[in-house]
A protein has these predicted regions:
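Conserved AMP-binding/adenylation subdomain of ANL enzymes
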Residues: 244-261, 269-311, 321, 325-326
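Conserved structural elements of the adenylate-forming
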Residues: 63-68, 202-208, 217-222, 236-257, ...
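Conserved pre-ATP/AMP-binding loop-to-beta segment of ANL
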Residues: 43-46, 168-182, 187-225, 231-232, ...
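Conserved ATP-binding/catalytic segment of the ANL
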Residues: 55, 76, 87, 414, ...
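Conserved C-terminal "lid"/linker of ANL adenylate-forming enzymes
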Residues: 480, 506-512, 520-524, 538-592
Length: 592
């Protein structure tokens, strides 16, 4: 038996909510072991499709390619437990490197391709990384490709040397370069770089398994840097057990099968792409299709059409951009009949957007995921057959073998009753092991209760219904406290999204002499110069639909081409909007 079955029925135990279900049995608790079984079962099935590269791999081919790369990496010194930075877009090289490192027992450290030199150095030095796999160019959404040579020269001033010599990252032994520049970047004089192609050859498939490693299911296999909605990213350490089971359970909720093809625009350097995407498909023998290295709405829709995709992933801003292309006739509204499911995550999905995705893209079984990097990442999720109101107003119920409680913001030991708002805390197999080499930050969020059970305190305000559905009402730090009353930005934002012409909206609190904080809203409107985009009309709209204390004092309009500052997972970085609001108000001399 692959899985140990238990009734997938929730039950309230005291004041916490627990769910039983299945976890992978002892034989398949390491990712490499489980992948070998999938290859044996579904070897001829498509595993990875990279449209931009015109490259695709079956499970057998992915196994052979990752074996070859693993041996190549081993030949340049990669060992079990080494931290290996991978700074690549959604590409075949990234997909192959993922399993090569898992098989070696090395630790995959995905790095955002948009990182600048300072960020890369900080990440590699913090983890004492031994190797870096990096593309010659970084492809970023809505931008021209960026050469990574200046970044490498910052890391290693003299790239012509045959040996790596980096004062900034002394632990660094080797840099493997992936040439994705189509001839725009010449690395022939950089002797300290090892070409990715020199480590593996597609012409000689390596079907022989690697020698067994002495690995444990609780070994760290992946270190993910948190998105950073409020502060500098932290390095969350995830295990074989946590991401293997999380990916499997996500796929179960979507009812994935080997016949499914998942279009995955979200990035592999983030848990959305790597666990919700790649691990979910790989645990079910399904295929994952990457349209481009970085998000491109046209390419995503064309991939769905050409590959007859059955699932589409995205954050709300991605879906909005895709629907706009269809509205404008840039992409013909056809070829989406095979779509049925997918995942919307990163931020709450407005009701109108959900309805349009059902109607226009046939995503009638679209699911909603909730989680955080530190929980591998998903702790709650809707099912494909949950009523639409549950998929709009909640983030679903807990995944199997996850426990949750809602606690007082003032006292973490005070578990609040059902239907009461407080901070959500979760426990179970999915918790990270720690923030790498940061016991202080780890202790701030991973807090044991009186029985010694460790809980991850999410920083999200939530409530839980009697039947286990969780509603996220916002970040605790994003609550606007006006005159001692808590205001939830999401309530205002959902109201604004129903105003004609509004594409996106975000509410933040700004300092106010009388009330402590006042409500400020940022609005992206289709016609920002029109009569409809009027501050007083916006205030009147909110006043008519909500109570007076929720009416924004300040209204800021952005152009349709602009976007809010967001993390890699699509979460709005409200602290940056708050800073912008304060700056603009000071310039207008509206307050001190």
């Amino acid at each position: 038996m692959l899985c140990e079955e238990a009734p997938p029925v929730g039950s309230i135990a005291g004041k916490t909510w627990t769910v039983n279900g299945k976890l992978f049995s002892r034989s398949y608790r390491m990712i490499g072991d489980h992948f070998a079984k999938i290859v044996n079962q579904y070897g001829d099935r498509p595993a990875v499709i990279c449209k931009q590269q015109n490259d695709r791999a079956t499970y057998s081919s992915l196994d052979a390619r990752s074996n070859a790369l693993a041996r190549g990496l081993e030949s340049v010194g990669v060992q079990t437990g080494d931290r290996v930075g991978v700074m690549l877009g959604n590409s075949m090289e990234h997909a192959v490197a993922t399993y090569a490192l898992f098989k070696l027992g090395a630790i995959l450290v995905p790095l955002n391709p948009s990182f600048n030199a300072t960020q890369v150095v900080s990440a590699l030095a913090h983890l004492e990384a031994s190797h870096l796999i990096i593309s010659t160019e970084s492809n970023l959404p809505r931008k021209d490709p960026r050469s990574n040579i200046p970044l490498l020269q910052h890391l290693i001033p003299d790239l012509s040397k045959t040996r790596i010599d980096s004062e900034l990252v002394p632990s660094l032994k080797n840099i493997i370069s992936v040439d994705n520049s189509s001839g725009r970047v010449n690395t022939s004089d950089f002797n300290c770089l090892t070409a990715y192609k020199s480590l593996t050859s597609d012409a000689t498939p390596d079907k022989s398994a690697l020698p067994p490693r002495n690995l444990s299911p609780t070994d760290i296999v992946n270190i993910q840097f948190t998105s950073g909605t409020t502060a500098m990213p932290k390095a969350a350490c995830l295990s074989h057990r946590s991401i293997l089971n999380n990916g499997s359970q996500i796929g179960d909720r979507m009812r994935l099968t080997p016949e499914d093809v998942v279009c995955c625009p979200p990035p592999l350097f983030h848990c959305f792409g790597s666990v919700l995407g790649y691990m979910a498909t790989a645990t079910h023998g399904a295929a994952i299709a990457f349209p481009t290295e970085a998000f491109n709405a046209k390419a995503a829709l064309r991939t769905v059409q050409e590959e007859k995709c059955t699932a589409l992933y995205g954050v709300p801003t991605m879906f909005i951009e895709e629907l706009s292309l269809l509205d404008e006739g840039v992409i013909p509204n056809e070829g989406f009949q095979y779509l049925r499911t997918g995942i919307a995550a990163g931020s709450s999905i407005p009701a109108e957007l959900m309805k349009r995705l059902h109607k226009v893209l046939n995503l009638t079984e679209l699911t909603i995921c909730y989680g955080m990097t530190e929980t591998s990442p998903v702790s709650a999720m809707t099912t494909t057959d949950d009523p639409i109101d549950k998929r709009i107003n909640t983030v679903g119920r807990l995944l199997p073998h996850v426990e949750a409680k809602v606690v007082s913001l003032d006292d973490h030991n005070n578990i609040l009753p059902i239907n009461t708002r407080g901070e959500l805390a979760v426990s179970g197999y999915l918790l990270m092991k720690e923030y790498w080499n940061d016991p202080v930050k780890t202790a701030e969020v991973m807090i044991p209760d009186s029985d010694g059970k460790v809980w991850m305190h999410t920083g999200d305000e939530a409530s839980m219904s009697p039947d286990g559905y969780i509603t996220i009402t916002g970040r605790v730090k994003d609550l606007i406290i006006r005159g001692g009353e808590n205001i939830h930005p999401l309530e205002i934002e959902n109201c604004l999204l129903t105003y004609p012409g509004v594409i996106d909206a975000s509410a933040v609190g700004v300092p106010d002499e009388r009330y402590g904080e006042a409500v400020a809203v940022f609005i992206i409107h289709r016609e920002p110069e029109s009569e409809a985009a009027d501050e007083d009309k916006i205030r009147q709209w909110v006043r008519e639909k909500l109570s007076n204390h929720l009416v924004p004092k300040y209204v800021f309009f952005l152009q349709p081409s602009e976007s809010f500052p967001k993390t890699a997972s699509g979460k709005v970085q409200k602290f940056k909007l708050r800073e912008d609001a304060v700056k603009m108000l000071k310039e207008k001399n509206n307050f001190g």
